[in-house]
Amino acid sequence: MSAYLSNPRVWQESWDRQQEAFLHDREERFAAMLEAVAATTEGGAPKVLDLAGGTGTISLRVLARFPGARVTVLDQDPVLMAIAEASLRERGTVVDADLGDPGWRAKLPEDGFDAVLTATALHWLPAERVAALYGEIREVLRPGGIFANADHMPEESLPTLSEKLRDHGRAEREARYASGAATSWSDWWARAAADEFLAPRAAERERIYPGTRHHQEWTPPALWHVDALRVAGFSEAGVLWRGGTDAAVVGLR
C-alpha cells in the first residue's frame, strides 16, 4: 500500500520537518499571525483563507487555535493540495487556483474572510504581480479583516548582516542534510514522486511548473511590502514580526 494512503499524516509531518530546516523559527511566525487573527476577530471562529497554502500548514494551526474556524486552502500544486485534502478532510476546503492569474478570486467558495494568511510563498511572484495581488486580497476581506504575509524580507539597513545570516543558515542547513537530521527540498520531492498515490500528482506538478520556475525568487525588504499594502488600500500596514532575514507584514482592511 502507498505510504501516503496508509498514513497521510506522515507526509504532513515530513513537510513540516523539511521546511523547518529552512526556517528554524517557522512556528514563531505562525504564532504571531494567529495572535493577530485572535485580536481582530470576535467570537473565536474566524473565516480564514490560507493563500498559497500548500499542505494546509497554516490552516491546521488555525483549527488547533480556533476549533470553530472555517478554513479555505488555495494552491495550485497537486502534490501539496492532496496532502492538504487528506489532512483537513471535512474541516476545510481546498481550492485549485493560480495566483498569477487575477481571476483566482472567482474560484473561491465565498469571500468576506476575517483573515487571509500566507507564508513563504509570494516570493515566487514578480513585483508587479505581488502589488496587484495585495489589492485583490483586500477585496476578499471583510471590513476590519486582516492580511498577513510572512516571507523572506531582509532588513534593508543591514545588508552585510543579512548576507551573513543567510550564509550561516545555509551552512547549518547543509550540515543537517549531511548528518541525516533533515530532509532536503530535492529529497522530499523525490520521495513524493516515488509514492504510489502521490506519483501521478508529482508528474502533473512537473507539467504545471517549468523546471526553472522555482529559481526566480524576489525578496524585497519588509518596507516594500508595507508600502505596497498601503497603495493597495489597506487602512493600516506594518511589520508584525521579524526573525533574522524573515518578517511578517500585516494589513488591515
Role assignments for model-derived ranges:
Residues 217-232:
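Short alpha-helix
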Residues 120-124:
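Short catalytic micro-motifs in class I SAM-dependent methyltransferases
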Residues 232-253:
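Core SAM-dependent methyltransferase catalytic element
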Residues 131-143:
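A short glycine-rich, Lys/Arg-flanked "PGG" loop and its adjoining helix->strand segment in the class I
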Residues 117:
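A conserved beta-strand element that flanks and buttresses the S-adenosyl-L-methionine
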Residues 49, 56-104:
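Class I SAM-dependent methyltransferase SAM/SAH-binding core
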Residues 1-44, 57-61, 148-184:
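Conserved class I S-adenosyl-L-methionine
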